[in-house]
Amino acid sequence: SPYGGEWANDPRERDLHTYDCVWEYPYKSYPNFISEHIRTAPPVRHSLEKIIRGSIWPEGFTGQILAESKNIMPDTWVERSHISAQGQRKTGDYWEFYDAKNADDLLYRLGAAYGKEIRRYGEQVRIGSKNPEVFSRRSKGYFACKLVDTWPKIYCASIDFFQEGYIPYYSLKRVFSPVLLCFQKEESIRLWGVNDSSKDIWGTVQYGILNIVSGRIQKAKEKKVFAAQGDSVIVDDLADFQFFSKDCVLFAVLDREDGEEALVCIDYVDIERHLKFPKPNLKLELCGDELVITAERFARCIQITGEQEGDKFGWLFTDNYFDMLPGQRKRVKILGNKEYGTLYVKSQYGCCRSISYTRGRI
């Protein structure tokens, strides 16, 4: 594998490996079947610290990419990369994110780039095709490569050797949740709804354009929607929004008639390093084993971590590394094997908040 087609890795027939990070080839927008989707990124920091030898940010390493630079990662990281498979070359588009000043910045830069690629390919497959009525041109499947590391290394796994998930894991979980809202950005911007749940779905979608810094909605619409079980539908074409500033985001919120939690989709029209993000002023509360987060302003990449007497391993959440709209209130269930500890919540461009946690406390 890959097998079939006019040449090896022909996206139009049989199966495809998504190595467009190192190869260029035609017909890749809606491949027939993705049998291996791969990008590379390090694991979470506490896992990385266990697998490398030496400093996590060696003296003299700046994070800058210059003409004479050999790698984007420090040598201590590269030693644990899958070098024979050119793992250091198979990153996502990290240059779309701000330069790194420290290890945490670089972990985010590489993780966010991988997560963005998972979302891009996952949404393409879920939508199926720009011409959904032509079944022969639909994408018909997707295998993430890979789900779990069987050896402590820096490569492509969504869950690392120590069973910790980082941005790629939660991106994968979101994009393949049964019900999906997503924006297709090609010759026009179209909002899609995908329903791979076990039942038909009715609801109301509010969608539009939001200025990141001011928090003001520039343009908005509301529409009743229906998505049959197993179907993907175009909710609307946003061409009538005409032009708008690239320091805005696209947003859509689905309120379901069956009472399930509202579904929120946020997407961008410019790369992250071109944008400025406000400090969101997060508020935290606990309702039993649910963490409730409220953002006063737009929040980029909310990151939830936990610690129990110095141990950062073993925490798991229903969602993590997500954006939030101004005024949004999000509930996240606390999973994992920890009975108590401290939860830390921060956005990528904001300060950190903490709250004490005891499992089962009301």
Feature-to-residue mapping (PLM):
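Active-site neighborhood of glycoside hydrolase catalytic domains
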Residues: 1-3, 163
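Intrinsically disordered, low-complexity Pro/Gly/Ser/Thr-rich segments with frequent PxxP/GP/PP motifs
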Residues: 206-246, 312-338
